[in-house]
Amino acid sequence: MASKATAITLTNPQEYDEEARALYEMHGNRLLAIPNLRFTATAQESRMINEMPGPKIIVSASGMADAGRILHHLKHNLWHENCSVIIAGYQAEGTMGRRLIEGSKQVKIMGEDIKVNAKIYNMKGFSAHADKEQLLEWYGKMKQPPKAFFVTHGEFDAASNFADELQRRLGTAA
């Protein structure tokens, strides 16, 4: 899915923000013309990366690092002390991603205990989700806004605070 999304993104520069548009104008459709860059289409191709010798950079959609291809990459790399794992974005409580950024020394992946020797980094500024102000702006542009919102995403305190904010600022049931 990420490969397809990347292809769509590369063919729609009119949707880029100012910074990305400047890069596109500089490099054109060669924006990702990086030597040895490979996209994997199947889970099997992705797992084969772990069998390749030598150093590598694996970019994977991690989500909360609880399911999918990322588990194979973590299982095969967390124990390497010369490995670094960069987790981009928020990680919910109770998830593998949260345990890693909080410094767990061992995790269970696919039934196997894996020692964490890799360096773990968290880049908090990345998110595929709109923030509170972006959601309020989106709501403000609706021609016929709904009579009520159901806030179902996020940890309880943040979701509850956002629901209160919706009610206070917009007079909308949430």
Whereabouts are the PLM-identified features?
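Acidic/His-rich, metal-assisted hydrolase cores and their charged scaffolds
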Residues: 1-174
